[in-house]
Structure formats: structure tokens, C-alpha cells
């Protein structure tokens, strides 16, 4: 596997394919965290580009009802940040993992300890949706000599100069937030969304992935056309929990040719 998340995603981009990153909630499995490796390998076998792994939190301000409920199920299974870290140490995969966590669980664990404990795992990225750009210095110094990238989230309502500020020096990929509000609100897009995505894509020197509300074949086609790929969360989480078939959707996403 390429050493960094950026290298992995750039290789997919160079091959003329769309990047596809599914989101899963750690511990949202009938086996709790004991089922995490099974889910990761299921997605890996389908050819996904990377996997976003959520840490459950009791006050998930950016999450819609599907992911919020998944977090509550995970917490009910006894998932903790410490237990997740220990589980990740045991999982062997060629797919880079990206941790999505609110700052509170990270703060409680200790940012430096968290980064050190993940050093020899497949984790190559970190998303903290409630960490303002101005406070990135709480985390970035601990990532400086690692292969873990701090992923910026960029709202498409943000002006171009602010976008440039948010993505300056970023690694991994840029998470373009397609909707205003929480995850899972499919189809609630701005009329000028494509224009703003294209604008962000022009000023970025790493892959731009679109997320929040992406759930249909039409969404895959639309956002692959104006960005480098997509992140899908609620649709994946719901299907895995309810035992619904999701393989065909993932295969279509993975096979998308630019």
C-alpha cells in the first residue's frame, strides 16, 4: 500500500477512477468491536478506496439520525475509544482507515497518546468535525512526524479566500460538505453546488471528496463529475445494520470511471 493517504488516493485518481470512501460506525455490529475487522474486510473485498471509521459520541452535532442511532447502539455495546484503539492494532488491511471523531473523546484520551497508539495501525487520516481550523494546533503538532493526515472539512458556502486558508498545507484529502446541516439529508443541495465544487477543485492540490447526503446513483455520477470522489455514510450504516444488500451500490461506486 502507498505510504500515505494522499499517495493512495492520487494513485486511484491517476488511474482515471472515482475515489469511494464508505463510512462505518465502530462497534455498530451485533458482535460490537469484535465485528469491526469483518466489516472492514467486507468493504476491502469490494474494492473501496479507504474507509472512514467513526468513534461513537453522545452528542454528535454533525450527524443525522441514522449515524446518531448507530453511535448509540455502539455505546450500548460498550465501545470506548480505548477499546477501539486496541482493536485497530489487531486489524490487518491494505485499505487506509480514516478516523472520524469529535474532539471530546480525543481530548479525554489524550491527543498525543491517541496518535502514538495508532502509529502502527492502518489509520492514515483523522477527521474532527467540531474542531475549528483556528484550533488545529491542538492536534497538528502530534501528527507532524506521522503518516496520519488531519482532514479539513470545507463548507461550499465558504468564500474562495477562506477555502484557500482552510486547505493550505492539507494532506490526505479535502472533505467538501455538500449540504448545510447534518449528515444523511439526501438531495437538499444548493442550486450552485456544482459551481462551488468545481471552484474548490481548482484551488486544491490534493483530492477533493464530496460527502454529507450522498446516497444515490445520481449523486455518485454528479459528484464524481465535479470532484475526485464521494464519501457515503448514512446509506452504508443503515444497510449494514438492517442487513440490506449494499454490494451493488458499492461496486458501482468503486467502478466509476472518470
From Swiss-Prot:
Keywords: Amino-acid biosynthesis, Aromatic amino acid biosynthesis, Lyase, Tryptophan biosynthesis. The keyword Hydrolase does not apply. It catalyses: (1S,2R)-1-C-(indol-3-yl)glycerol 3-phosphate + L-serine = D-glyceraldehyde 3-phosphate + L-tryptophan + H2O. Its EC number is 4.2.1.20. Pathway: Amino-acid biosynthesis; L-tryptophan biosynthesis; L-tryptophan from chorismate: step 5/5. GO terms for cellular component: cytosol. One of its GO terms (molecular function) is tryptophan synthase activity. The active site is at residues 52, 63. Tetramer of two alpha and two beta chains. HAMAP family: Trp_synth_alpha (MF_00131). The alpha subunit is responsible for the aldol cleavage of indoleglycerol phosphate to indole and glyceraldehyde 3-phosphate. Belongs to the TrpA family. This is Tryptophan synthase alpha chain. It comes from Streptococcus pneumoniae (strain 70585).
